[in-house]
Amino acid sequence: MLSDELESKPELLVQFVQNTSIPLGQGLVESEAKDITCLSLLPVTEASECSRLMLPDDTPNHTNSSKEVPSSAVLRSLQVNVGPDGEETRAQTVQKSPEFLSTPESPSLLQDLQPSDSTSFILLNLTRAGLGSSAEHLVFVQDEADDSGNDFLSSESTDSSIPWFLRVQELAHDSLIAATRAQLAKNAKTSSNGENVHLGSGDGQPKDSGPLPQMEKKLKCTVEGCDRTFVWPAHFKYHLKTHRNDRSFICPAAGCGKSFYVLQRLKVHMRTHNGEKPFVCPESNCGKQFTTAGNLKNHLRIHTGEKPFLCEAQGCGRSFAEYSSLRKHLVVHSGEKPHQCQVCGKTFSQSGSRNVHMRKHHLQMGAAGSQEQEPAAEPLMGSSLLEEASVTSKNLVSMNSQPSLGGESLNLPNTNSILGVDDEVLAEGSPRPLSSVPDVTHHLVTMQSGRQSYELLNQGDLTERRT
């Protein structure tokens, strides 16, 4: 952890190692620890206290006792000034504690730091008391990347007379280089083996993060007869659901009942019910809205004129703005005709061609049949049906006698049994022409009802004979 003094001036610090455990060398670890105060290289107030830490003895010739040094005297030993160009300059203060300077047991920690030296800050954060264990944490902060100012290091770097904090800084520098090289090697190995797999978001699609490296498709479908391979685990999982027909996400709307493999597809489908269209065309004077980003992308090709989907059939060369249009077009080259006319049975490769055929032929035939039926329906609604010998109807079941005769209602049997006509008689609204009824010779039938009797002759005339 960083002390409060370091947090007060973050602009002076560049973290050298982030919470990295750096074990000290065996040459720096002594069996006996020395009790001195922590030395802060940043000026702080008088009230601040530095925690007491256990430091190893610098040399084996030192005694096993140490004198406690007041922290305020050490804090005044350095003054740090930040220049206008961001460079740091250090100057020793004129006033120094005589007790600190006159102590023979205390190591000369700041003896090698001169005002002209462009050295870097050394920030020691000792989480436990003492440096005798390799598990103790050291956090080093260095604000300069230029090593040209380290001229105070003597050629005999392994000499025990070098201050201990300089040896610790050297160990930290070497450890950082080794850790950086190890991390770079690990990243290179990961990218080459294709282990850096990123999963997509809710629809199962990976996020677009620039050009992807060429990775081997290791995920192979285990279903018999399917040889598809995948890179992304989300795609592979979605593909396996298509084999199992695992449509576990069902639309809750009443009367819909559609099901989907993934939840994202269901969410997109729900926009068709609630009318939500969040994707708007940005072109001027257009403003069309769409439920999905894919539909908007396909629509924008109308404005740009882009047709990226090209038919690869020999001699075709047609291109389309949408992949679905290309897929429909490929049926033409395959010779398959799945769309059949329900009236005449003719088949077509495209549903649009079938619809054009039905509007052109079958609707005209229906209109012509209705026009032929209208003139023939007029005599049915006009005069009596008995005046036409060739016209009979199932609706003619009863007829009333004249009121002047005072007779009752005369119920006639079905005219089909009387005239011998089959069931293929014309009803009102039938498209068949009325002239298609065959002319059948009828016999005389006498019917009596009360005081009157009627006769149906061959000629179809109705005669009345009083009794």
Curated annotation (Swiss-Prot):
Predominant place of localization: nucleus
Transmembrane regions: none
Binding-site positions, Zn(2+) 3: C281, C286, H299, H303
Modification after translation, per record: O-glycosylated. O-GlcNAcylation may occur in response to increasing glucose levels and affect transcription factor activity. Sumoylated. Sumoylation increases its half-life, possibly by blocking ubiquitin-mediated degradation.
Keywords associated with the record: Activator, Chromosome, DNA-binding, Glycoprotein, Metal-binding, Nucleus, Repeat, Transcription, Transcription regulation, Ubl conjugation, Zinc, Zinc-finger
Pfam families (UniProt xref): zf-C2H2
Annotated residues for binding of Zn(2+) 1: C221, C226, H239, H243
SMART domains (UniProt xref): ZnF_C2H2
A single Gene Ontology CC term: chromosome
GO annotation terms (biological process): negative regulation of gene expression; positive regulation of transcription by RNA polymerase II; regulation of transcription by RNA polymerase II
Zinc fingers typed C2H2-type, residue spans: 219-243, 249-273, 279-303, 309-333, 339-362
InterPro entries for the chain: Znf_C2H2_sf, Znf_C2H2_type
PROSITE patterns: ZINC_FINGER_C2H2_1 (PS00028), ZINC_FINGER_C2H2_2 (PS50157)
Binding sites annotated in the UniProt record for Zn(2+) 5: C341, C344, H357, H361
Localization per Swiss-Prot or TrEMBL: Nucleus; Chromosome
Chain spans, region Disordered: 84-111, 187-214
Keyword Repeat: yes
Record-listed Zn(2+) 4 binding positions: C311, C316, H329, H333
Binding positions for Zn(2+) 2 per the UniProt entry: C251, C256, H269, H273
Quaternary structure and interacting proteins, as annotated: Interacts with CDKN2A/p14ARF.
Function noted in UniProt: Transcription factor that binds to the sequence motif 5'-CATCCCATAATA-3', and is specifically required to silence expression of fetal hemoglobin in adult erythroid cells. Prevents expression of fetal hemoglobin genes HBG1 and HBG2 through CHD4: acts as a direct transcriptional activator of CHD4, a central component of the NuRD complex that represses transcription of fetal hemoglobin genes HBG1 and HBG2 in erythroid cells. May also activate transcription of matrix-remodeling genes such as MMP1 during fibroblast senescence.
Entry text on domains: The five zinc finger domains are necessary and sufficient to bind to DNA.
Protein name: Zinc finger protein 410
Source organism of the structure: Bos taurus
Gene: ZNF410
